[in-house]
Amino acid sequence: MALQLWALTLLGLLGAGASLRPRKLDFFRSEKELNHLAVDEASGVVYLGAVNALYQLDAKLQLEQQVATGPALDNKKCTPPIEASQCHEAEMTDNVNQLLLLDPPRKRLVECGSLFKGICALRALSNISLRLFYEDGSGEKSFVASNDEGVATVGLVSSTGPGGDRVLFVGKGNGPHDNGIIVSTRLLDRTDSREAFEAYTDHATYKAGYLSTNTQQFVAAFEDGPYVFFVFNQQDKHPARNRTLLARMCREDPNYYSYLEMDLQCRDPDIHAAAFGTCLAASVAAPGSGRVLYAVFSRDSRSSGGPGAGLCLFPLDKVHAKMEANRNACYTGTREARDIFYKPFHGDIQCGGHAPGSSKSFPCGSEHLPYPLGSRDGLRGTAVLQRGGLNLTAVTVAAENNHTVAFLGTSDGRILKVYLTPDGTSSEYDSILVEINKRVKRDLVLSGDLGSLYAMTQDKVFRLPVQECLSYPTCTQCRDSQDPYCGWCVVEGRCTRKAECPRAEEASHWLWSRSKSCVAVTSAQPQNMSRRAQGEVQLTVSPLPALSEEDELLCLFGESPPHPARVEGEAVICNSPSSIPVTPPGQDHVAVTIQLLLRRGNIFLTSYQYPFYDCRQAMSLEENLPCISCVSNRWTCQWDLRYHECREASPNPEDGIVRAHMEDSCPQFLGPSPLVIPMNHETDVNFQGKNLDTVKGSSLHVGSDLLKFMEPVTMQESGTFAFRTPKLSHDANETLPLHLYVKSYGKNIDSKLHVTLYNCSFGRSDCSLCRAANPDYRCAWCGGQSRCVYEALCNTTSECPPPVITRIQPETGPLGGGIRITILGSNLGVQAGDIQRISVAGRNCSFQPERYSVSTRIVCVIEAAETPFTGGVEVDVFGKLGRSPPNVQFTFQQPKPLSVEPQQGPQAGGTTLTIHGTHLDTGSQEDVRVTLNGVPCKVTKFGAQLQCVTGPQATRGQMLLEVSYGGSPVPNPGIFFTYRENPVLRAFEPLRSFASGGRSINVTGQGFSLIQRFAMVVIAEPLQSWQPPREAESLQPMTVVGTDYVFHNDTKVVFLSPAVPEEPEAYNLTVLIEMDGHRALLRTEAGAFEYVPDPTFENFTGGVKKQVNKLIHARGTNLNKAMTLQEAEAFVGAERCTMKTLTETDLYCEPPEVQPPPKRRQKRDTTHNLPEFIVKFGSREWVLGRVEYDTRVSDVPLSLILPLVIVPMVVVIAVSVYCYWRKSQQAEREYEKIKSQLEGLEESVRDRCKKEFTDLMIEMEDQTNDVHEAGIPVLDYKTYTDRVFFLPSKDGDKDVMITGKLDIPEPRRPVVEQALYQFSNLLNSKSFLINFIHTLENQREFSARAKVYFASLLTVALHGKLEYYTDIMHTLFLELLEQYVVAKNPKLMLRRSETVVERMLSNWMSICLYQYLKDSAGEPLYKLFKAIKHQVEKGPVDAVQKKAKYTLNDTGLLGDDVEYAPLTVSVIVQDEGVDAIPVKVLNCDTISQVKEKIIDQVYRGQPCSCWPRPDSVVLEWRPGSTAQILSDLDLTSQREGRWKRVNTLMHYNVRDGATLILSKVGVSQQPEDSQQDLPGERHALLEEENRVWHLVRPTDEVDEGKSKRGSVKEKERTKAITEIYLTRLLSVKGTLQQFVDNFFQSVLAPGHAVPPAVKYFFDFLDEQAEKHNIQDEDTIHIWKTNSLPLRFWVNILKNPHFIFDVHVHEVVDASLSVIAQTFMDACTRTEHKLSRDSPSNKLLYAKEISTYKKMVEDYYKGIRQMVQVSDQDMNTHLAEISRAHTDSLNTLVALHQLYQYTQKYYDEIINALEEDPAAQKMQLAFRLQQIAAALENKVTDL
């Protein structure tokens, strides 16, 4: 029976080892990116939606069906079906799966893709290749999902009610090319009137309003009872914030009356941390009494609390209660509720005023109640789980036995298993790595039986078990797993789920892992037992499972046979064993394992270690103390005095027994005196004894087994004992402790005689050391013997001799002193107090008593000396003087550092500096301290040169290097070290390496030239969830530092990847680049650097590959996972095998033509003389076998194959063929040469565009960050209107409307202001104003410029009543239209601004579109402007000719190759106290250009209008000790005849890294030559005798003499050469294309919100066309184009400074003009036929113009289809503008300026008013005369 049990135990251990092996997860890999996952609960089939594919897998992820869904011909702007003839922009487009849902009742699958505006299809669940429904020609009504890959779509298949229609509820964000529908309900079955996927009813959609600027990202959709819910994030722009919203609506509500949304917020338990912001995933489950919404939220690094994620819970009963409370508050609450409530997707809500109980009476809302409804008063939850530094990306929840388990996906590729406790806390109990550093996608789905979990990464889906209970072989491991699924099934002896344990419901039969402990023995009675006794052991077991009559327990004691146990309550009674193991040596007991087993199945229950003691062994545990050792242990042993033995206690003890724990009753000897005994001297030792009755009269002996002596003991009369020691000797130590034994007749009597033997001579070589010995030792210095001995061994003692100095350290010191001197020698005193004076080289040296060593060492601190000096050392020790010999001298000298190298390094430190100088080896290394601006530089090498490693600095710049010795700084000639910006890592490739390493990793960035030491470092931390495949082997954390780099320059470093452990997936690997003191993560936006397991290769069959003359084929797995064809190497013997193909499983290479010799030749075995085939990937090599060439030759002689008759014929044919081939080859080479040149040109342009665009996007990230931080510099309303209305006037920014200054004498000001207010009232009379305008327009001298200015004045004057202004404009416009219609030229209307009303329209549009510019269109316009500016300034710009290398304008193109180099200069702004600022410039920039770039960078956080002018600042360069002011022109300027070249940085030889100082100085303080400004602004320089140039001289003036003599042909050649540079236009255009497209889309995309003014005016134009029977679409198109795009957008595009606080340079303006012209061309319907003679600007955008034209057409069409804006809505909108901005305008000044026109045409106006009947009735002429009298201070005739 025992053997059976041990076999079972062994099998259990083997099972345990097997279970520790890592479970290989089932997975499926897709060739394309995966998007969605769904699982059929009934069949277990898994469905995957991917890019261009659908997959149908079985439950174990084996492929059953695969269907291709793309790519297909499509364009987001085109309406399906797509025809290439109709959609010219169509191209092959990927189909991203946007929606994948199951409809099990109808056995069908719903799938929607991003192709064709997001249309959907129905497929059969049993076979996805069978498509049940698909229609791409139904138009907008069938557009369901988003066609933007970045906009999420969620959905839910359900029914409208019991027995109702099957419908699809859809939520999606509003993408740039979407139809604007946010939420919709779609049919899934055809009806008589509707197709599948059409809206359920006409009202079953919600569409974003035309003014909506919010964007949504939907996260989840679910249903609860009669309701459907959506979870989504919304990015609000006013105010800018991110919100997570929960929306609810009734399933049976076809009109969306019940739609209600409210905020969800997930708070951090830390009240100081910011709330979590964006919801990343959500799931609903019912763990207990009710359903709960589980949602994971993220928080970015900019928030307080740092980056991280949290899990929040929202019980749905609380959600419903809150939503009902919100509905009731809106329906029946006060009007003030509108602050809490709003109308989703734009609009206002009218709450309040409804009967109490409306919410209950109409649970799904009603038409008469407010809808849709949004509430800012939402639900808040506190995170039950937080994780810092990573995002939780997926969540799903399961319930097991009323316990809630959450499975969470992470951004680094793990699945976290979390137990959610009932009290609202959480506990993470497991973490499974599915794919390292791969984001787990949102679809995390449980199988139908809830036994498996499906998780999805980018291209893989995994099946994970929800629990692994059976992998825990013992109850302890099961309990320690803390897995809520698991518990210990007692009757089966294994870890199981509760449902798998047959008697789980019985008491203590299933022990849950998180609450109950394992079955254990808590106590035993008796607690121990003698090995010589027999009896019963009663074990208390808890928890003891309830046992039935059939259950029988067995006891198994050690190796004894098992026997039945008795069970009494919780006690189990076992019999003691018949045989007990031998007691181990040195112990007094042996522990025997008691095992309790269940007989049925021999199931192990628990075990207990039971001790059996042995008293005979107990007496020998303590040396020389047999009795005390016996009775003092924990057992019940007793000492028998008669027999001198230890035995078990008896119930009735006899006399002569020392009982247990009565050790004081033992006979014993103690108290020796003396306690110390000198060596080599006989010593009398006395000691005492007690309890000696049993040894009286016996012979006693004392001795030691260690020193092998035994002496007799004599008893003194006083009752004490004595013995005399022999001369004992032991030279190994100074002292030797002895425990002496006492024996009586050979038996040990307990002895506590502990003495110490000591040796005076040991370690005391001189007198001072001897005197310093312990006084108890009584050591004395014996002069005659010159040694230290016991005092009794020396006849005469002598005093100590004088001190002896043998050496000093160090031998040199600085003049400043302060360093420690160590004096070594002998007889240097007995104690620190003996040292009375120390002198070093004649200078006092302060004694350091704490560092003193008796007799051998004195340490002191030297004081300063005035001059260098060398001298000896003197020490006064207790009145005795010791001097150093002549060869021991100390020198004072002055160390002097002279230079340091290198002179710059990274801000993070770690640079090794070498300091050169004289006497730097003064003192010792510990005396030297090097600092840089107070930060220590750790000294690592001391000698003639010092080396130290810099520490990190808080700031960058030049730091003074200071060296001090002994705390005193030494003279410094001004040695500086410059801290530069830490190196920046921008990219790296390749992205991964095999674990064996050795792959070349190219890291690119900036600033690498500063670095001395590079290393690629890998930090490997074992994953907790990983279990090693070998038992007894655990994974240890480690740090792997790679070998040095193999190449580096300033922008590139090449490493060889270091080797990491063989199983990289078992570790969390962090890869760093170590650059001196700076560490940077090897990670970019594309992801982190990865390690993958090494590939595996199959060895050649039989070890030899034969007949390999052409190709060698090797097989393996994962061959190309981290290796490319170019990197892989293969060898045949010693020669290379040329790589041809490398795939995941195959490698092909071409061997050398002749079989090479093997690398390692074997002598005997001919097989081994064949060359080896070696594959080398990085650092690792695989020898796959040997190769044998095919060396067979033909058996037929060559003379028979080629007889002599055939040879001449062959020669003739060959010559003919050769001649023909030669001709063909020559023609082919010419063709290939031309083709190669064309391809090279095309490739160079493409590469340049790609590189420039990449660089621009990187640079623009900083600009975008500035935009996000400081906002777009939009001008305030007044400045905007001033610039739009009046900046183009003749006075420009000096115009009185901009300055606001009225030249009116103060005494007259009140009268004038009162009169102007009356004039304002007069202007508010429509009759007066119409007459006024007509009269002015009839005046011949009233020019077009005057009309424009007059209209702008009128706009400001009437701004307070914009609805009245609009009415006037409306009236005048109708008159204008009538004129053009009568003249039969309606197309010409609005072409120019030749009338007052046309300018009024321009101003009206400018006013109404200000807010739209500020909120929407401004950002892409500003980014376009900044992108052009950055691109232009990236290359040379000729400051004189205003031409640039990078431009869109061919006339502004710099037609020459100018050599230039980018520089980064450090700029210090004087008197502003800021750190040096790095600024990027070009060495060919003029000083004014440099100033502008510096000002642009330094003051980037301030408005441009607050920047200093370039001519108001001075730029100073300090290359050394001198300073030089930089200016455009000075005495050093280069002259060539009459030409003078503008100075550049190259002229001054300013280099990269130079420091420039910018200071604001008055003109009078500037040197005369520095007061010059840009050449274009100096009139004197434009004179004939003083011409200036910058980069290129004008081609017609380079050399007039040559020009006159040159031929026409030479001039043509010059022009042709200039045309070569036109390719730059393509490069710049390609770089800026994305920004141009973004601007056009923001202005013309119909999906964007359209300002109401545009809709209102376009409808007005449509009405007028219809009224006048104008059916020509071209005419209406021209009207709309002339009224908005050309009248407003072109003006803003060409003049960004009208809306932004920016300065527009001429070269930027030139490129803006080209884009503006393209915009104008896009708005015309006429086709432009292009030819070679077409302007370059037209040719540049010839490809895109058709797209832009289509955008304009769609824009006009989309506006026409929008909901009409009523007059009332428009007037309300205008009134809001008036109310918000009128007070800021110079209305009074405008009235005054308007009156000037009245004054000028006074008589004509009076006559017109008197002739008009309406004006006569209102006495308008009289009122004007009164105003004139007041304003002109004259008496009228009235």
Curated annotation (Swiss-Prot):
Record-linked InterPro entries: Ig-like_fold (IPR013783), Ig_E-set (IPR014756), IPT_dom (IPR002909), Plexin (IPR031148), Plexin_cytoplasmic_RasGAP_dom (IPR013548), Plexin_RBD (IPR046800), Plexin_repeat (IPR002165), PSI (IPR016201)
Can you tell me which residues are glycosylated? N127, N242, N391, N402, N528, N733, N759, N795, N844, N1002, N1049, N1068, N1099
Sequence ranges assigned to domain Sema in this UniProt record: 20-466
Q: Give membrane topology per the record.
A: Single-pass type I membrane protein
Q: Where are the transmembrane segments?
A: 1198-1218
**Which GO MF terms are attached to this record?**
semaphorin receptor activity; signaling receptor activity; transmembrane signaling receptor activity
Q: Where does the IPT/TIG domain start and stop, copy by copy?
A: 803-893, 895-980, 983-1092
Q: What keywords sit in the KW lines?
A: Cell membrane, Developmental protein, Disulfide bond, Glycoprotein, Membrane, Phosphoprotein, Receptor, Repeat, Signal, Transmembrane, Transmembrane helix
Question: Which parts of the sequence lie on the Extracellular side of the lipid bilayer?
Answer: 20-1197
Which GO terms fall under biological process for this protein? brain development; excitatory synapse assembly; homophilic cell adhesion via plasma membrane adhesion molecules; negative regulation of cell adhesion; neural tube closure; neuroblast proliferation; positive regulation of axonogenesis; positive regulation of neuron projection development
Outline which residue ranges sit on the Cytoplasmic face. Answer: 1219-1838
Report the SS bond pairs: C78-C87, C112-C120, C250-C364, C266-C312, C330-C351, C469-C486, C475-C518, C478-C495, C489-C501, C555-C574
- Entry superkingdom: Eukaryota
The role this protein plays is: Cell surface receptor for SEMA4C, SEMA4D and SEMA4G that plays an important role in cell-cell signaling. Plays a role in glutamatergic synapse development and is required for SEMA4A-mediated excitatory synapse development. Binding to class 4 semaphorins promotes downstream activation of RHOA and phosphorylation of ERBB2 at 'Tyr-1248'. Also acts as a cell surface receptor for angiogenin (ANG); promoting ANG endocytosis and translocation to the cytoplasm or nucleus.
Q: What is this protein called?
A: Plexin-B2
Species: Homo sapiens (Human)
Name of the encoding gene:
PLXNB2
